[in-house]
Amino acid sequence: MAYVRLACLAVIFFFAASVMFTVEAGIPCGESCVFIPCLTTVVGCSCKNKVCYNNHVIAAEANSIDDHHLLCQSHDDCIKKGTGNFCAPFLDHACQYGWCFRAESEGYLLKDFLKMP
């Protein structure tokens, strides 16, 4: 009798685990960002029109760099917008825009420290 209960529990656990992995693989950025920012920024999601999208999808659908605050075509665009200092292009060559990052080198961090008083 205990084996029947254990077998039923194992089947339920297996079903729940398979559903969890299917949903996780299908919709990586499926939440809304109305009141809080995207929780899936670690996997490359950003908020656009109160819905979280993949970053490369935002870049591919954009008509200009003004469509999203992190889109850029050069490092100067990132610096002008104040969203970073490095424009990284996507690996997909169909995307004509890149994504702004904050990249700080050791020399950039020490430039004010080494000034003579």
Swiss-Prot record:
Disulfide bond residue pairs:
29-45, 33-47, 38-52
Q: Which residues form the signal peptide?
A: 1-25
Q: What is this protein called?
A: Cliotide T9
Q: Lineage of the source organism?
A: Eukaryota, Viridiplantae, Streptophyta, Embryophyta, Tracheophyta
Kindly indicate whether the keyword Disulfide bond belongs to this entry: yes
One GO biological process term is: defense response
Q: Can you name the source organism?
A: Clitoria ternatea (Butterfly pea)
Propeptide position ranges = 56-117
How does the record describe the protein's post-translational processing? Contains 3 disulfide bonds.
Does Cell membrane count among this protein's keywords? Answer: no
Q: InterPro entries annotated for this entry?
A: Albumin_I_a, Cyclotide, Cyclotide_bracelet_CS, Cyclotide_sf
**What top-level branch of life does the organism fall under?**
Eukaryota
Crosslink Cyclopeptide (Gly-Asn): position given as 26-55
Can you quote the domain comment?
The presence of a 'disulfide through disulfide knot' structurally defines this protein as a knottin.
The record's similarity note reads: Belongs to the cyclotide family. Bracelet subfamily.
- Print the keywords alphabetically: Disulfide bond, Knottin, Plant defense, Signal
Task: Provide the function of this protein.
Answer: Probably participates in a plant defense mechanism.
Q: In which tissues is it expressed?
A: Expressed in seed but not in root, nodule, flower, stem, shoot, leaf and pod (at protein level).
